[in-house]
């Protein structure tokens, strides 16, 4: 947050205002990275190993998030009917995915991560460079559902999606198509 978001740590802000906050880095991101540093080659190697074991890095992250939400909801001082999640960028993807795959989450906000596969699977987009893109891939899911379809599973609950018009990772045409889905 030091270089982004005006230096405001969202979790700290919520905690200072009385909310219970659990902020978990995805495996191979932030504090759960490698001691020698995280790079795209290492992330791709991790993803490859998950696939060889019949799973995926993306599925692991999703289940890690579900277990984290279940833990928060189980705390005696937490109202399990008021558990929510919020995320920016990769965290936004994790937020809407988490809300879609567990009833533990009652409300979510996702800032700057929504698009369609058609607009992300281009030669110049970050999604095709490997590395961290594998953290969001669930084998065979795109065969049935695109990103906005998956996100819509969360939408019977209060759900906020917010995207910027100049986000270099998410072409505005794809954002508009996703919102029209």
Report residues per predicted region.
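Cap/lid segment of the alpha/beta-hydrolase catalytic domain
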Residues: 1-63, 68, 73, 119-122
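Mobile cap/lid helix-loop segments that gate and shape the active-site cleft of serine hydrolases
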Residues: 44-45, 49-53, 67, 106-151, ...
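Conserved hydrolase catalytic core segment
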Residues: 100-106
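Glycine-rich nucleophile elbow surrounding the catalytic serine of serine-hydrolase chemistry
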Residues: 87-97
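Short beta-strand/loop motif that positions the catalytic acidic residue
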Residues: 154, 161-163
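Alpha/beta-hydrolase fold nucleophile elbow
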Residues: 77-89
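Alpha/beta-hydrolase-fold catalytic nucleophile elbow
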Residues: 25, 86, 111-112, 162
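Acidic catalytic loop of the alpha/beta-hydrolase fold
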Residues: 166-170
């Amino acid at each position: 947050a030091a270089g982004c978001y005006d230096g405001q740590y969202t979790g700290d802000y919520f905690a200072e205002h009385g909310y219970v906050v659990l902020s978990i880095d995805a495996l191979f991101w932030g504090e759960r990275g490698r001691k020698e540093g995280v790079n795209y080659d290492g992330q791709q190697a991790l993803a490859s190993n998950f696939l060889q074991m019949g799973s995926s890095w993306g599925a692991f992250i999703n289940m890690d998030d579900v277990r984290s939400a279940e833990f928060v909801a189980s705390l005696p001082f937490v109202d399990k009917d008021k558990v929510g999640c919020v995320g920016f960028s990769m965290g936004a993807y994790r937020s809407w995915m988490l809300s879609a795959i567990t009833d533990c989450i009652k409300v979510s906000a996702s800032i700057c991560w929504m698009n369609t596969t058609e607009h992300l699977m281009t030669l110049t987009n970050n999604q095709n460079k490997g590395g961290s893109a594998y953290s969001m891939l669930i084998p065979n899911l795109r065969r049935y559902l695109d990103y906005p379809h998956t996100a819509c599973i969360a939408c019977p609950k209060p759900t906020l999606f917010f995207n910027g018009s100049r986000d270099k990772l998410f072409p505005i045409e794809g954002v508009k198509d996703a919102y029209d889905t």
